[in-house]
Amino acid sequence: MEKQENVGHIVQIFGPVIDVQFPNEHMPAILSALEVKINDESIIFEVAQHLGEGIVRAIAMSMTYNLSKGLEVYDTGSQISVPVGKQVLSRMFNVLGQPIDGGKPLDSFIKNPIHANAPTYLEQKATSEILVTGIKVIDLLIPFIKGGKIGLFGGAGVGKTVLVQELINNIASKHGGLSVFAGVGERSREGNDLYFEMKKAGVLDKTALVFGQMNEPPGARMRVALSALTMAEYFRDYENQDVLLFIDNIFRFTQAGSEVSTLLGRIPSTVGYQPTLSTEMGQLQERITSTIRGSITSVQAVYVPADDITDPAPATTFSHLDAKTVLDRGIAALGIYPAVDPLASSSRALEPNIVGKKHYLVAKKVVQILQRFKELQDIIAILGVDELSESDKQVVARARRIRNFLSQPFFVAQKFSGIQGQFIKIQDTVNNFDELLSGKYDNIPEEAFLYVGTIDQALEKAKKMGWSEKN
């Protein structure tokens, strides 16, 4: 390439960061890709700072083993670019858009730079169409909007990744559009499992996967979400598609940015995070939107450090989301999955003019009963249920049935649980909870409502437990 005639030399190396001396009049632009060739391999860096006197500081996108001072560095003259278009479907890539699935190299393809401007106000399009997930607790209480941004918040081990995988299974297989999955700083094993699950489910041919896992340097983890988003944007803007973008885990994007910020010598902000946290998050999130050409619906898993929802990383993500789904360790400890906390979760789509009046009223009533149940917990812990008034006893009994009925067997978990996964239509969910609220099933054992899809299945389970309608 002609642009590679601009050659510099490494003058300093510290971990995944290098300083490179270029001629003063030929310093590479910020965000330019630099290339170091060593032992028949190529290491790509991205320019992050100009230090002056012709020296630039750059972040590595892969491991920096075998680097040494004095090595030649080539300015590619362009930003990091990744392949886009139909050739990326059914394939797995790294942050640089290189296939990592052992498949054949891509033929001729289009490449787009990973950095781009967000759509303008005139290009954006608002929508209020509900995205059906088939998961009762989500469809009833936290409905997702097509073209919206959805966050799944939770600490370690409460079921975020399993919920993301179930959403991929339910939505990707039902909606028929294209999907892009970004594995950001998570376990390689989970990526491997997801790849084969999607292959088995027959949705891989409509999906592109991009991974920058937790064993990779911070530069790769910070940019991999942008690589995946670039692929999704092409489908939206040039092929007029409705795209699903799954990101697991958006916290690792922030965490990688924090590591890079420290390596670049920036003074840390609150709780040690980078001072540019809001800017970096905004630049990513504002590109994820619906336009007049197509839509991107994003589902993002958000790790909550030490279960502290006020931590700057999850708190910064909140403001960009249309629906907030909070997973709770206490609910998981009860053995209720998905461990969604209905009282901490919210969605701007839960409005009567969007979901319908009946759906809205049923959802509000469910939340009211669960809220009252929570208020009574301290009294129950001290005095016991017997000391409650008759009306409160009824609330407690009904709330326990509702809480159990919000659980659901997942398709992606059936090989572990042995229970067949369930996809429940919204209308069935609303009608079932409406009947449950009416007291029609107050005499059915509350255990019968655990891990069933519908009321009819709960009745069958109750009969197997020895319950009869005469009871």
Curated annotation (Swiss-Prot):
Q: Which PROSITE patterns match?
A: ATPASE_ALPHA_BETA
* Coiled-coil annotated residue ranges, if any: none
Its catalytic activity? ATP + H2O + 4 H(+)(in) = ADP + phosphate + 5 H(+)(out)
Query: Mainly localized where?
Result: membrane
| InterPro entries listed in its UniProt record | AAA+_ATPase (IPR003593), ATP-synt_VA_C (IPR055190), ATP_synth_F1_bsu (IPR005722), ATPase_a/bsu_AS (IPR020003), ATPase_alpha/beta_chains (IPR050053), ATPase_F1/V1/A1_a/bsu_N (IPR004100), ATPase_F1/V1/A1_a/bsu_N_sf (IPR036121), ATPase_F1/V1/A1_a/bsu_nucl-bd (IPR000194)
Pfam families membership: ATP-synt_ab, ATP-synt_ab_N, ATP-synt_VA_C
Per UniProt, the keywords (alphabetical) are: ATP synthesis, ATP-binding, Cell membrane, CF(1), Hydrogen ion transport, Ion transport, Membrane, Nucleotide-binding, Translocase, Transport
Question: What Enzyme Commission number(s) appear in the record?
Answer: 7.1.2.2
How this chain sits in the membrane, per its record, is:
Peripheral membrane protein
Q: Locate the residues binding ATP.
A: 154-161
Top-level taxon in the UniProt lineage: Bacteria
Tell me where it resides: Cell membrane
Name one cellular component (GO) term.
Answer: proton-transporting ATP synthase complex
The protein's GO terms of the molecular function aspect are: ATP binding; ATP hydrolysis activity; proton-transporting ATP synthase activity, rotational mechanism
Subunit composition and interactions: F-type ATPases have 2 components, CF(1) - the catalytic core - and CF(0) - the membrane proton channel. CF(1) has five subunits: alpha(3), beta(3), gamma(1), delta(1), epsilon(1). CF(0) has three main subunits: a(1), b(2) and c(9-12). The alpha and beta chains form an alternating ring which encloses part of the gamma chain. CF(1) is attached to CF(0) by a central stalk formed by the gamma and epsilon chains, while a peripheral stalk is formed by the delta and b chains.
The record ties this protein, via NCBIfam families, to: atpD (TIGR01039)
Family affiliation = Belongs to the ATPase alpha/beta chains family.
Q: What's this chain's function?
A: Produces ATP from ADP in the presence of a proton gradient across the membrane. The catalytic sites are hosted primarily by the beta subunits.
Q: HAMAP family of this UniProt entry?
A: ATP_synth_beta_bact
Question: What name does the UniProt record give this protein?
Answer: ATP synthase subunit beta
Give the organism the record lists: Mesomycoplasma hyopneumoniae (strain 232) (Mycoplasma hyopneumoniae)
Lineage of the source organism? Bacteria, Bacillati, Mycoplasmatota, Mycoplasmoidales, Metamycoplasmataceae
